[in-house]
Amino acid sequence: MKVIASTLRKGNVVDKDGKLYVILTAENIHPGKGTPVTQLDMRRITDGVKISERYRTTEQVERAFVEDRDHTFLYQDGEGYHFMNPENYEQLAVPEDVVGDAAPYLQEGMVVTLSTHNGVPLAIELPQRVTLEIVETEPVTKGQTASSSYKPAILSNGVKTSVPPHITTGTRVVIMTADGAYVERAKD
């Protein structure tokens, strides 16, 4: 379907010259003089080539139909990451480059939103927060109170983060998947 270029956002998929591109960044630029434009940084889905395009904000762009469905993460092997559609129990192997930075946060049984176009996986969206265990951090020093100073820690998935001084090794914590930031101690 055709849409105005200024309405495109990150994560949308556009059809340009018969090839599909996923939008990495979309910025509307209004110069003091001249016509406003929309600057799009895109990645070709088939081979990962990145391109940058400028469109007049009123120009029509072909937006591809993308289906977003919840899938359950099962396991990872040489073929990629395997997900199951809970409605019809169909399994889908997603390549490593599509999973990208989300890979360390995937846990068996986790429900994610999988975006597909004609059955081809394009992107996955994780839950905003995940609960993980601290496997390594500095010991608690007596007299330290809950202050604004943070100490480095390594999570059970290998990601490094910063946690408050009262958190010890073995503690389960809630982490933001977007940036790996500590939110709170897990309530379980």
Swiss-Prot record:
It is found in: Cytoplasm. Pathway: Protein biosynthesis; polypeptide chain elongation. CDD domains: S1_EF-P_repeat_1, S1_EF-P_repeat_2. InterPro entries: Elong-fact-P_C (IPR015365), NA-bd_OB-fold (IPR012340), Rib_uL2_dom2 (IPR014722), Transl_elong_fac_P/YeiP (IPR020599), Transl_elong_KOW-like (IPR013185), Transl_elong_P/YeiP_cen (IPR001059), Transl_elong_P/YeiP_CS (IPR013852), Transl_elongation_fac_P (IPR011768). One of its GO terms (biological process) is peptide biosynthetic process. GO terms for molecular function: translation elongation factor activity. SUPFAM superfamilies: Nucleic acid-binding proteins, Translation proteins SH3-like domain. Keywords: Cytoplasm, Elongation factor, Protein biosynthesis. Disulfide bonds: none annotated. One of its GO terms (cellular component) is cytoplasm. Pfam families: EFP, EFP_N, Elong-fact-P_C. The keyword Glycosyltransferase does not apply. Its main location: cytoplasm. Belongs to the elongation factor P family. Involved in peptide bond synthesis. Stimulates efficient translation and peptide-bond synthesis on native or reconstituted 70S ribosomes in vitro. Probably functions indirectly by altering the affinity of the ribosome for aminoacyl-tRNA, thus increasing their reactivity as acceptors for peptidyl transferase. This is Elongation factor P. It comes from Methylorubrum populi (strain ATCC BAA-705 / NCIMB 13946 / BJ001). The gene is efp.
